[in-house]
C-alpha cells in the first residue's frame, strides 16, 4: 500500500515541479533578452551621442572655417581692388536724382529741402548727373582743376604774359617777400629753406600739365587723362599746392597795386579789410597755410581762386534753396570772355561737380 502511494506522490511532485522549472527558464530568457536589449540600447545611445557630438564639432569647425575664409577673401578682394583699381578722387557720373534719393532719405526738414533743391537742379537747370568728389580739404581745388583740365580751358591771360615758373623767385628776390619761406604745404606742414625749390617744382608741374591738357582737342582723350591724373594722390597734391601759391601771388600783386593807390577789385578790398588777412603775409599764415590740412577754401578764397584763374565759378548752394544765395558766382563780376565752370555744395565745405 505504502509502495503504491510512493510512486503516486513522486509523479505528483514531478508534475508540480515541471511548471516551476519552465517558469524559471522563461524568466531567465526574458532577463537575458532584457539585458541584451539594454546593452544594445546603451551602445546605440552612446554611438548616437558620439555621432551627434562629432556632428556638432564638425558644424562648429566648418562654421569657423567659413567665417575665417570669408574674412580672408574679403581682405584679398580689398587688397586686389586697392592694388589694381584706380582710386579716383573724382568719381564717374551718376544720375542726379538717384544720388539724391540715396543720400537724402527720411522726412526731416533738411532732407526735404535737399530733395527739392536737387529737383530744382534737374528740372530748371537741366543738370542730369553728378560727379562725386573725394571729401577732404582739397576738394574745392580738385573740383575746379578737374573741370579746367577736362574742358581744355586755356591759361588765364596774365599767365600767358609771364612765365609762372619764375613767380616764386620773383616774390622772393624782386619783391623782397622773405616771409614766403613760412609757406606751409597743407598736411605736410613743411617750412624751411627748401620752400622756394618745392614751390618752383610744383608750379612748373602745374604749367606742364595744364599745357598738355589744353593741347588735346579730343574730349574723350582728355577725360581718360583726367582719370589717370586724378587717381594719383601725390601728383594731385602738388598741383593743389601750386594753385594755392598762384592765389597767394595774385593777392601779393593786388596788395602792391593798392599801396600805389591803384583801383583794385572789390573782393580784395574786402579781403584786406579783415584783421586776419590785412596783408599777404597774414593771409598766408591765417588762411592759406591751413587749406588742405585743417580746412578747405572759404567763400572769399573761392573769389580769389576764380579771379586768379580767370574762370567764372558758379556754385549751387543747395542748403540755401529758396533764397537769393542759392546760386552764386565767384567772382561776382567776371569778365564776359571768362569760361564758366559749375560746382554744387550741400554745406559750403565739400563740393561736387554737376554734369549738364
From Swiss-Prot:
Residue ranges of the region described as Disordered: 1-22
Residue ranges of the region described as Required for membrane binding: 1-83
Domain of life: Eukaryota
Subcellular location field: Cytoplasm; Endoplasmic reticulum membrane; Nucleus envelope
Keywords: Cytoplasm, Endoplasmic reticulum, Membrane, Nucleus
Ranges where the OTU domain occurs: 128-356
InterPro entries in UniProt: FAM105, OTULINL
Membrane topology summary: Peripheral membrane protein
Stated consequence of mutating residue 352 to N: Fails to confer catalytic activity
GO cellular component terms, A-Z: cytoplasm; cytoplasmic side of endoplasmic reticulum membrane; nuclear envelope
Predominant location category: cytoplasm
Pfam families: Peptidase_C101 (PF16218)
Function: Lacks deubiquitinase activity.
Quaternary structure, from the entry: Does not bind ubiquitin or ubiquitin-like proteins.
Family statement: Belongs to the peptidase C65 family. Otulin subfamily.
UniProt note: domains: The N-terminal region that precedes the OTU domain mediates interaction with cellular membranes.
Name of this chain's protein: Inactive ubiquitin thioesterase OTULINL
Gene name as annotated: OTULINL
